[in-house]
């Protein structure tokens, strides 16, 4: 097959992906091989591929394809999350467009409509993953609501309940009044809102005075139950134990001592509303209030309802919370108890989907005893059973698990795993995997099922084992079954649990990663994965966070359409540095598209010069130094790549193969062998060179395949008839015996020699076509041998002709390589005086800008107060001007 003149990614990507999938090449079908397993973080079934997905899934695919090339039984579990809230909202919006509401249907009818939507529209993101090149095991695609996974979810709920680790309790939750459900912290978006800080005075019950409190939510005073002061605050020590009489309600509430009150903040006294504030809830418990006795003044829509003590005036009942706020402030002002109002920017929680202000709300929900489950999870990381990369995240992990709270796992939705709990007429609960079992527990009493569903994080926490056979395969074979050479007898669960690596954004470390560790240890007795890799965010080119409101989001599919999937994948991999966010600039994607084009053109050159597929895994025999050098460089690249991938240093691995392909192979090797392949050259040397070049190109394609799967598969087949695809080829062996130090030293010297001459020519504005004589001074015998042996290459690539004798007097450039100095006469080639003046002027300008930037960076006011992206740009500009001044200075120095 003749390689087309132009590289067109769109012409090859869909064809090769269909070929791989149709031929089952993504499936783990090597039962005797070492298993290697990754589970994909299941994207929402409602979702579309965003740039964060593209990063996350590219990093996983690099590891999976690499493991496959290493001969492992590579399984990449793929599937989607049912996304309770998001999916229910999508279907409700569709109904709304038809003038219908969810409540117009029975629960069963509505759920049937959700399944209809899922079958029709739920495959968008999986189709988009294919466009990225993700080599997932699509034949066994999972869904968190499919029958097998749902069975696992119900079993876990029932087992945890029976073990006393899951229970019903009254606690505060993040309540979304728009969706009328509890939501997780991850679904809460904090925004800065311009608001007020109201200062009230509460009269002491004995009439002896008043105490000042301040609040940003005055309406909640209708449910105040205490005023807290710091026990060390001398101003209030005598008041501890006394009571105040609340304005409006007349409720008597105690003054309690609690360290939550900060003597330095406001008056030092804090109103306590345990039913509507997370901090106050804890203060209330410490003060002796039971959750069941804490006052609640809002309903599910955040409208005022009567408290248990009946003290809220009737004209407040039914008011929206913000209407109630205005009415409370007006009433307190009318009583003369409004001391002052301050303008303040308030951190306000919003539901990320409803955009409603979130209300801390006291309600009955189902909770998991996360504190008990967290202890083994902490030890798993401390002991090294799980390696966290970057290691710096372990501190955050420990801090969160050491202070973990009970986990609210119930949601007030219809779509999701309905909680397997039933109630009799007296409210007694019966927990079982199905209604028949619950009825048996209840002795045949009439039962009503709990209407709530489970938090999607509860089900997705089972993903590493619930997707590969648990609970059906649990206990079928001992783990050592496949290790003893009987791999075919081991269940999928035994072979692929624990998983090898989990790739995750750091933002779900607590919501998903830690909970998988807790559930995996509890139900499987082993960690769910051996390594946890946490990547950063993909940001805009200027470092700002991407958001639709800013209009700076990047569509990965648009980049694929424009530059190809390989270019996007390589960009994300090359920019993925442990512990850092990615600043995505489209120019980088364009640059790596150019890299793909360079590889394409190198393959065209090879094909046009009779270089084809290699016939051997081992490097061919070679006598020419340039061939021995490129073989050694190939082996060194394999070694470096193996280390970088093992250490999950993605940027290092991508840059290693990039530098080898672009510089060593294309810029140097192919240029150096052109004379060897020319017509009339030594046929033996030409044959050797074709064999070596073909072998090296094969190794390049295999090494590059995990990063750029499409172009490598295309070129693999274009360069020769193969009876297997590159996706299942063999990873190169890093045989150090193939490294020839003498050849490496010689060609490295040649590259330095040509590079220094080229730099001198460029820096001094020597016309590209001008040939210059070069006079060697102080060259050793070995250097003179090298000059003679490589004279043709030097003349061709540096455009200089080696001359004997002394250099003529006059202006000249001086190039130093090792011990030798090369004099390049420039009289009549360039205007030496004008060139000196140009360089001096350029140096002065660069140094002036450099020094100005240094002064700005040395100013603490700039570094501390300027936007981070402005400081970073100043640092980059300073480095650029420093390098420019250095390079211009070196050019001037060469003129002597």
From Swiss-Prot:
One of its GO terms (cellular component) is cytosol. ATP binds at residue 548. InterPro entries: aa-tRNA-synth_I_CS, aa-tRNA-synth_Ia, Anticodon_Ia_Val, M/V/L/I-tRNA-synth_anticd-bd, Rossmann-like_a/b/a_fold, tRNA-bd_arm, tRNAsynth_Ia_anticodon-bd, Val-tRNA_synth_C_sf. GO terms for biological process: valyl-tRNA aminoacylation. GO terms for molecular function: aminoacyl-tRNA deacylase activity; ATP binding; valine-tRNA ligase activity. Transmembrane segments: none annotated. It is found in: Cytoplasm. Pfam families: Anticodon_1, tRNA-synt_1, Val_tRNA-synt_C. It catalyses: tRNA(Val) + L-valine + ATP = L-valyl-tRNA(Val) + AMP + diphosphate. ValRS has two distinct active sites: one for aminoacylation and one for editing. The misactivated threonine is translocated from the active site to the editing site. Catalyzes the attachment of valine to tRNA(Val). As ValRS can inadvertently accommodate and process structurally similar amino acids such as threonine, to avoid such errors, it has a 'posttransfer' editing activity that hydrolyzes mischarged Thr-tRNA(Val) in a tRNA-dependent manner. Belongs to the class-I aminoacyl-tRNA synthetase family. ValS type 1 subfamily. This is Valine--tRNA ligase. It comes from Rhizorhabdus wittichii (strain DSM 6014 / CCUG 31198 / JCM 15750 / NBRC 105917 / EY 4224 / RW1) (Sphingomonas wittichii). The lineage of its organism: Bacteria, Pseudomonadati, Pseudomonadota, Alphaproteobacteria, Sphingomonadales. The gene is valS.
């Amino acid at each position: 097959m003749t390689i087309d003149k132009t590289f067109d990614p769109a012409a090859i990507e869909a064809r090769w992906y269909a070929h791989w999938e149709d031929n089952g090449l993504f499936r783990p079908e090597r039962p005797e091989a070492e298993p290697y397993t990754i589970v994909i973080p299941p994207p929402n079934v409602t979702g579309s591929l965003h740039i964060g997905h593209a990063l996350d899934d590219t990093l996983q695919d690099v590891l999976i394809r690499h493991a496959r090339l290493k001969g492992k039984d590579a399984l990449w579990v793929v599937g989607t999350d049912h996304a309770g809230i998001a999916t229910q909202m999508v279907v409700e919006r569709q109904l709304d467009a038809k003038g219908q509401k969810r409540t117009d249907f029975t629960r069963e009818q509505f759920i049937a409509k959700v399944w209809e939507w899922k079958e029709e529209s739920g495959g968008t993101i999986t189709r988009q993953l294919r466009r990225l090149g993700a080599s997932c095991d699509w034949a066994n695609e999972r869904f968190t609501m499919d029958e097998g996974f749902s069975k696992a979810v119900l079993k876990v709920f029932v087992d945890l309940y029976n073990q006393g680790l899951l229970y019903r309790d009254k606690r505060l939750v993040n309540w979304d009044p728009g969706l009328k459900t509890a939501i997780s912290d991850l679904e809460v978006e904090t925004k800065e809102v311009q608001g007020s800080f109201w200062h009230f005075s509460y009269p002491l019950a004995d009439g002896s005075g008043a105490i000042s409190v301040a609040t940003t939510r005055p309406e909640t005073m209708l449910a105040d139950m205490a005023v807290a002061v710091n026990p060390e605050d001398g101003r209030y020590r005598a008041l501890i134990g006394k009571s105040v009489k609340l304005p409006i309600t007349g409720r008597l509430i105690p003054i309690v001592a609690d360290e939550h009150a900060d003597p330095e903040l406001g008056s030092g006294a804090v109103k306590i509303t345990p039913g509507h504030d997370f901090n106050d809830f804890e203060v209330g418990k410490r003060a002796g209030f039971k959750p069941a006795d804490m006052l609640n003044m809002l309903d599910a829509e955040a409208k005022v309802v009567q408290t248990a003590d009946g003290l809220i005036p009737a004209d407040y009942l039914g008011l929206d919370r913000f209407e109630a706020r205005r009415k409370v402030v007006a009433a307190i002002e009318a009583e003369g108890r409004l001391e002052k109002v301050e303008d303040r920017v308030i951190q306000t929680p919003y539901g990320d989907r409803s955009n409603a202000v979130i209300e801390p709300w006291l309600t009955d929900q189902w909770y998991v005893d996360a504190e008990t489950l967290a202890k083994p999870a902490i030890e798993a990381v401390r002991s090294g059973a799980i390696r966290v990369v970057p290691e710096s995240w372990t501190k955050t992990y420990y801090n969160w698990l050491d202070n973990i709270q009970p986990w609210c796992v119930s949601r007030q939705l219809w779509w999701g795993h309905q909680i397997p709990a039933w109630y009799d007429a007296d409210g007694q609960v019966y927990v079982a995997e199905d209604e028949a079992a619950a009825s048996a527990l209840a002795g045949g009493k009439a039962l009503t099922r709990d209407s709530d569903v489970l938090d999607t994080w509860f089900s997705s926490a089972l993903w590493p084992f619930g997707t590969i056979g648990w609970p059906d395969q649990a206990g079928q074979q001992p783990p050592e079954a496949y290790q003893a050479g009987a791999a075919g007898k081991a269940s999928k669960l035994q072979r692929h649990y624990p998983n090898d690596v989990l790739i995750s954004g750091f933002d779900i470390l607590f919501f998903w990663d830690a909970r998988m560790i807790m559930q995996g240890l509890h139900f499987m007795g082993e960690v769910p994965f051996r390594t946890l890799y946490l990547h950063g965010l993909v940001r805009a080119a200027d470092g700002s966070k991407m958001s639709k409101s800013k209009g700076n989001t990047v569509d990965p599919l648009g980049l694929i359409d424009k530059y190809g999937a390989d270019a996007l994948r390589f960009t994300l991999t090359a920019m993925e540095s442990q512990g850092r966010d990615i600043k995505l600039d489209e120019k980088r994607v364009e640059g790596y598209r150019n890299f793909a084009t360079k590889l394409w053109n190198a393959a065209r050159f090879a094909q046009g010069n009779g270089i084809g597929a290699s016939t051997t895994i081992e490097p061919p025999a070679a006598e020419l130094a340039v061939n021995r050098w490129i073989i050694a460089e190939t082996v060194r690249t394999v070694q470096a790549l193996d280390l970088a991938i093992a250490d999950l240093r993605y940027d290092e691995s991508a840059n290693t193969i990039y530098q080898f392909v672009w510089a060593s192979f294309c810029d140097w090797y192919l240029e150096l062998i052109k004379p060897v392949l020319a017509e009339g050259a030594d046929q033996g040397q030409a044959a050797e060179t074709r064999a070596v070049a073909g072998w090296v190109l094969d190794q390049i394609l295999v090494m590059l395949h995990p990063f750029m799967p499409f172009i490598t598969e295309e070129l693999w087949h274009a360069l020769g008839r193969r009876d297997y695809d590159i996706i299942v080829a063999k990873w190169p062996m890093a045989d150090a015996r193939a490294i020839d130090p003498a050849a490496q030293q010689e060609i490295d010297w040649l590259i330095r020699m040509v590079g220094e001459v080229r730099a001198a020519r460029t820096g001094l504005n020597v016309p590209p076509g001008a040939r210059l004589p070069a006079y060697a001074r102080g060259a050793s015998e070995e250097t003179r041998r090298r000059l003679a042996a490589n004279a043709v290459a030097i003349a061709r690539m540096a455009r200089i002709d080696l001359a004997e004798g002394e250099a003529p007097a006059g202006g000249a450039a001086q190039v130093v390589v090792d011990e030798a100095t090369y004099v390049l006469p420039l009289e009549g080639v360039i205007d030496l005086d004008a060139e000196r003046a140009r360089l001096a002027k350029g140096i002065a300008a660069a140094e002036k800008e450099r020094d100005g930037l240094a002064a700005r960076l040395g100013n603490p006011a700039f570094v501390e107060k300027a936007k981070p992206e402005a400081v970073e740009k100043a640092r980059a500009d300073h480095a650029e001007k420093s390098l420019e001044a250095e390079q211009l200075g070196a050019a001037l120095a060469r003129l002597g």
